[in-house]
Amino acid sequence: MPQHKFLFTSESVSEGHPDKMCDQISDAVLDAHLAQDPHAKVACETVTKTGMIMLCGEITSKAVVDYQVLVRNVIKKIGYDDSSKGFDYKTCNVLVALEQQSPEIAAGVHVDKDSDDVGAGDQGIMFGYATDETEEAMPLTLLLSHKLNRKLHELRRSGELEWVRPDSKTQVTIEYASEGGACVPLRVHTVVISTQHSPDISLDDLRKELIEKVIKAVIPANLIDDKTIYHLNPCGSFIIGGPMGDAGLTGRKIIVDTYGGWGAHGGGAFSGKDPTKVDRSAAYAARWVAKSLVKAGLCRRCLVQVSYAIGVAKPLSVMVFSFGTSALSEEDLLTIVNDNFDLRPGKIIKNLDLKRPIYEPTAENGHFGHNNFPWEQPRNLKISADMLAKSQGPAQPDVIGIAH
């Protein structure tokens, strides 16, 4: 029986949100280098404000990249093709302030090292999370927030909702039941959508179309009831959007990118970083581990933490927490992880095949929960017969007490 009920909320932003624009541009730069030089070292930040994009950071690569063309193509794809929408790919100013990677970092991390023993590109802590509340092993609050944005902009691109502009935000609150540490979605409590729009639609019509064509198309009917609350463009008109409305910067939507506030976050952003940066690759690996444990039925929820020191290949620590949803102890789960996963950066890169130009799509609707990404493919775990038998027993109590 459910132990208690609680509300939890996650948000998402569209590809036309200024911060997400910057994430996509940074990852497009990364992909352009990896396409020509799989060993490229890239740390590219993007800044945007009215009529301006600036690339800054450090890149060491054999690739030749036309940044002017690349940046404008990303902005065009997003849909900013006229200044009335907040940005125009044809007329914006693209500034480039990119330098080479520090030779001190290069010497300490990868120069003259075997590929398996490449050191971590920096110190830091990274987390992975998984939950059995959805098929994707992602929190439903975040999954629905992403899907609302995705549907809204599918309709914009198709012309069915031609009044929609590229910049939007969504937010979903769900009422959950806690069931022995697992989270069971009961109903959608609140939906928030704020979307940029053309001047020629009334707020009443906008709100009706959002309910009929977006919300009802995305959120399962059994999760909606007569008490569900809707805040649709609650601030009123939203005509001025994109970089004209707000400045944008790479790496400012790290909770949208990950688990929507569930689990934990180590603080490092992903976009614009090649996979020797453990902020990115180790966070992907931690998700791979957590999802593999949940999909194997070893626990219903899982949080994994890893930590590194710059230039050191082996993780300093690995932690597995199951929120009291596993018949195995945390020590048992950690043994399974250590037996099945090598979390040195070089091995993560090799096992997940991360030296490929696969990153721009990750910057659009979250880095997790999409089965086309290699870290979303659960590993078939090798588990001893004794451990397997033990895993069929009653769940172990939560003795650590980590929050949602």
UniProtKB/Swiss-Prot annotation:
Enzyme class: transferase
Sites where the protein binds K(+): 45
Biological process according to GO: one-carbon metabolic process; S-adenosylmethionine biosynthetic process
Enzyme Commission number: 2.5.1.6
Cofactor: Mg(2+); K(+)
Keyword set, alphabetical order: ATP-binding, Magnesium, Metal-binding, Nucleotide-binding, One-carbon metabolism, Potassium, Transferase
Pathway assigned to this chain's UniProt record: Amino-acid biosynthesis; S-adenosyl-L-methionine biosynthesis; S-adenosyl-L-methionine from L-methionine: step 1/1
Reaction catalyzed: L-methionine + ATP + H2O = S-adenosyl-L-methionine + phosphate + diphosphate
Sites where the protein binds L-methionine: 58, 101, 246, 277
Ligand binding (ATP): 17, 167-169, 235-238, 246, 252-253, 269, 273, 277
Database matches in InterPro entries: ADOMET_SYNTHASE_CS, S-AdoMet_synt_C, S-AdoMet_synt_central, S-AdoMet_synt_N, S-AdoMet_synthetase, S-AdoMet_synthetase_sfam
Matches recorded under Pfam families: S-AdoMet_synt_C, S-AdoMet_synt_M, S-AdoMet_synt_N
Listed SUPFAM superfamilies: S-adenosylmethionine synthetase (SSF55973)
Cofactor note: Binds 2 magnesium ions per subunit. The magnesium ions interact primarily with the substrate. Binds 1 potassium ion per subunit. The potassium ion interacts primarily with the substrate.
Top-level taxon of origin: Eukaryota
Keyword tRNA processing: no
Statement: the UniProt record of this protein carries the keyword ATP-binding: yes
Positions bound to Mg(2+): 11
GO cellular component, as recorded: cytosol
Any one GO molecular function term: ATP binding
NCBIfam families for the chain: metK
Functional description taken from the UniProt entry: Catalyzes the formation of S-adenosylmethionine from methionine and ATP. The reaction comprises two steps that are both catalyzed by the same enzyme: formation of S-adenosylmethionine (AdoMet) and triphosphate, and subsequent hydrolysis of the triphosphate.
Comment field (misc): Protein expression is regulated by post-transcriptional regulation: under rich-diet conditions, mett-10 binds and methylates sams-4 mRNA, directly inhibiting splicing and protein production of S-adenosylmethionine synthase.
Similarity field: Belongs to the AdoMet synthase family.
Name the UniProt record assigns to this protein: Probable S-adenosylmethionine synthase 4
The organism of origin for this protein: Caenorhabditis elegans
Gene: sams-4
